[in-house]
């Protein structure tokens, strides 16, 4: 902008982004992509205990013996007050705790403050996120899927209801075009193998099928929920319950093949946090 010539031939430009989906195609095509995985909950906990807590205590003038934060409190902060791939939000929460502790020491004469999972809301307020745990019992038409987002792995319940009707197929839950097409592929596959599961040939003409993925305000997209939707539909149609401690992920084809998926590490960690004991993934 100062209209001076600059030789950029030897310059290495390094750019970062939270999601590649927001980068324009022509720009992305000229870049060498290096993907960095999000931190796990365990890694975040270690970063907090070894670096962030000490940093925030020093910034707020708190001595080592004046503040103690339990391991369970740190875990609750990570799961219930932040939803991120890094630790910026976690550091902000720890900063809020340190500032409130400093005020308690100065105004209330407290000599030391202990933060636990029981009094955490006193420091940070009501929980912002509710981590969905595994269902307590096996249910018909409800299957747990796994998602990979820009902030890490997540689990999502897929619900299917079957009711008398005229063959209507409905999808709700703020689904994107790719996920809708995946659902259509799943229902087509089930119809093609209906004889194998003793499903009446006229069933799909005499009944409506409704697929819903809760948290309708949150946009959802991607093909990897195909096998989950197919399983949920088959469960609802046959009346066979699905194990509550099982989650699955994979794109399904019209021939029933399950294609490879991404983000397996993040998805597996999300399943473990949610209390899922078995994860079904594509063989390849």
PLM feature segments, named:
Residues 8-11, 28-32, 243, 275-277:
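Short glycine-/polar-rich loops that comprise or flank the Walker A/P-loop
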Residues 1-9, 38, 235, 273:
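Substrate-engagement module of ASCE P-loop NTPases
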Residues 133-135, 139-144, 152-284:
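Peripheral, non-AAA+ core regions of ATP-driven protein-machinery
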Residues 1-17, 67, 207:
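AAA+/SF3 P-loop NTPase mechanochemical coupling elements
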Residues 70-162, 166-172:
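Conserved catalytic-core segments of large NTP-driven translation/proteostasis enzymes
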């Amino acid at each position: 902008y100062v209209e001076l010539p600059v030789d950029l031939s030897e310059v290495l430009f390094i750019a970062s982004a939270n999601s590649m989906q927001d980068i324009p195609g022509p720009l992305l095509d000229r870049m060498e992509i290096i993907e960095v995985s999000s931190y796990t909950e365990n890694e975040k906990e270690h970063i907090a205990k070894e670096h962030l807590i000490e940093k925030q205590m020093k910034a707020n003038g708190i001595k080592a013996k004046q503040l103690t934060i339990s391991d369970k409190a740190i875990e609750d902060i990570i799961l219930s007050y932040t939803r991120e791939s890094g630790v910026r939000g976690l550091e902000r929460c720890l900063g809020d705790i340190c500032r409130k502790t400093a005020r308690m020491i100065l105004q209330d004469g407290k000599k030391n403050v202990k933060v636990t999972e029981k009094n955490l809301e006193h420091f940070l307020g009501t929980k912002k996120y509710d981590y969905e745990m595994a269902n307590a019992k096996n249910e018909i038409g409800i299957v747990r899927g796994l998602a990979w987002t820009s902030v890490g792995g997540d689990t999502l319940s897929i619900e299917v209801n079957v009711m008398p009707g005229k063959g209507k197929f409905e999808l709700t839950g703020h689904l994107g075009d790719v996920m809708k097409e995946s659902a259509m592929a799943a229902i087509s596959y089930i119809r093609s193998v209906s004889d194998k599961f003793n499903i009446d040939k006229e069933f799909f003409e005499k009944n409506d099928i409704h697929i819903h993925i809760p948290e309708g305000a949150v946009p959802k997209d991607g093909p990897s929920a195909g096998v989950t939707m197919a399983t949920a539909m088959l469960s609802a149609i046959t009346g066979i319950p699905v194990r509550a401690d099982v989650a699955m992920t994979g794109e399904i084809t019209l021939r029933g093949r399950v294609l490879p998926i991404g983000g397996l590490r993040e998805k597996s960690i999300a399943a473990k946090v949610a209390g899922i004991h078995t994860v079904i993934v594509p063989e390849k």
